Amino acid sequence: MISFLLLLILAWSFYIGYRRGLVLQVYYLVATIVSAYFAGNFYQSLGEKFHLLIPYANPKEGIGTFFFPSDQLFQLDKVFYAGIGYLLAFTVFYSIGRLLGLFVNLIPTDKIDGKYFRIGAGVLSVGVTLFVLQMILTILATVPLEVVQNSLEKSIVAKHMIQSIPITTNFIKQIWVTKLIG
């Protein structure tokens, strides 16, 4: 069910990117990259503030995670809060970028409005959506609750989003896991 929902979101994302056109979608890709960079500067301090606001499920005996080694189990709360902080900072910066994108939409794009340009825009839109979904799923993967872990592990699409996307998987693991808990 999760796999179907994720694929549906990605298909919808392709359609939206196809309708927007290449110029606007390239702008949104740049806004995503810039937002990811700036979120990387603020996420740790934000994550520390969430310890009292957002509860984290304590790991229980015999329960682990499918996506992180067992020796990191008792430090995953740091990754969870850092992920929440990063996602919040990313959302704020990306929202500013989307607001500015309203003006990019005014640029005439008649010359690059062909079918292949629109397909390229759809692919870029899927890439942006994939990054956001990967952040959300990686945050969920840190929660040591059996229902969450089993749901993510049974979903082929979610499992590949968390572990197998070439560039962003390493980026997220580097800033959320390696930088925080080694």
Regions from the language model: what does each represent?
Residues 1-182:
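Alpha-helical transmembrane segments and their juxtamembrane interface "caps"
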